[in-house]
Amino acid sequence: YHMQISEGDIIRTINDNHDFIGHYHTAGVPGRNEIDQTQELFYPAIMKAISATGFKGFVAQEFIPKGPNPLQSLKKAIDLCDV
């Protein structure tokens, strides 16, 4: 989320700077809401790029759910990021 807002080109930024990244956050862009297939960011590709760097740390689901069931939104986000 933060990288897209600040710089864009997420996968290039991950590849260029992964040695300096300690953890990642997810959130839908725009709006910082649930992550899904309608957002600016395609998290399956992003997660594959993160995985390809050998990252062994944490990925925080840090979004503000709009739907009525926050746990269901979290489950969908985890499933989307499970590559």
Predicted regions and their residues:
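Histidine-acidic metal/acid-base catalytic patches
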Residues: 1-83
